[in-house]
Design a protein with these regions (language model features):
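An N-terminally biased module of ancient metal coordination in phosphate/nucleic-acid-related enzymes
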Residues: 1-77
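Active-site gating loops and adjacent loop-to-helix segments of metal-dependent hydrolytic enzymes
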Residues: 73-99
Length: 104
């Protein structure tokens, strides 16, 4: 791969959180923009990842499983976001984050 470049966006949101596009349309846009690798990092959910995996495969885009976790810094009183990538146990993550989604 020497001398080659890969265009990527590793912080995308779909309608599963605060994005404006459904996953298929989001990935079609990524393809039109020349992106070869994306991570859909919806807030506090991996629910769209199976659909994303299928659409990415159909479009020839490399998908990194990701999400954006909403958190609170008690020292500063600020809401913060933590990006996570390469998640393998989606069910466990979904179960852990379910109460936080309900509190929004």
């Amino acid at each position: 791969m020497e001398g080659q470049s890969l265009r990527a966006d590793l912080h995308l949101h779909s309608r599963w959180s605060d994005g404006s596009l459904p996953i298929p349309a989001l990935l079609e846009l990524a393809k039109r923009l020349g992106l070869g690798c994306v991570a859909i990092t919806d807030h506090d959910t991996l629910a769209g990842q199976p659909q994303a995996a299928a659409a990415a495969q159909d479009l020839g885009i490399h998908l990194i499983v990701g999400l954006e976790i909403s958190a609170f810094d008690p020292d500063t009183g600020r809401k913060v976001h933590i990006l996570g990538y390469g998640i393998r146990d989606a069910r466990r993550v979904e179960d852990t984050l379910a109460p936080y989604r309900q509190d929004r």
